[in-house]
């Protein structure tokens, strides 16, 4: 990173922001990944922001797995969560263009995503501004994602470096930037 940003005062918190729908969003994968991390990192927590048809099932899963540092916040404006969280975990099977990525990155939240759809690779550069667990036709590997997350959870310097890069990347998706791209396109057409 450029090292020109002040240190981000982030909490040791991983968030998920989105619909609680296990079919597309695969939120259960987030809990499976967290289950491998919680005891190793007792000072970290997982916060799930959003609501949907699978909320009760997911809450039951947390209870049955005896996970303690997990909270379900329901449907909320995510801004306050973006301001304080260090990492966003997204394990969807498919997405169009996940707006949550540039949105969270603009607050210096480092995205950790499952690379199961192409838009991820347009936004996140693995090891630079976030983490990508490559798609595997055998399925999502929670243990591998937990390993990738561990590196970030252990090093505030790594988190700061990637957070700064995430902020820079997010600027490409600001309204001004998108507007200028459209303007250039139209100018080239007419």
Task: Please provide the spans of the model-predicted regions.
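A short, well-ordered alpha-helix in the C-terminal region of glycosyltransferases
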Residues: 151, 158-172, 181-184
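Short alpha-helical donor nucleotide-sugar binding micro-motif in glycosyltransferases
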Residues: 75-76, 81-85
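Nucleotide-activated donor-binding/catalytic signature segment of Leloir-type glycosyltransferases, i.e.
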Residues: 56-75
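Short hydrophobic beta-strand element within catalytic cores of glycosyltransferases
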Residues: 110-114, 119, 124
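Short alpha-helical segment that forms part of, or immediately flanks, the ligand-binding pocket
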Residues: 79, 98, 102-106, 121-122, ...
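A conserved mid-protein helix/loop that constitutes part of the nucleotide-sugar donor-binding site
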Residues: 12, 21-36, 53-59
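Aromatic "clamp/platform" in nucleotide-sugar-dependent glycosyltransferases that forms part
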Residues: 93
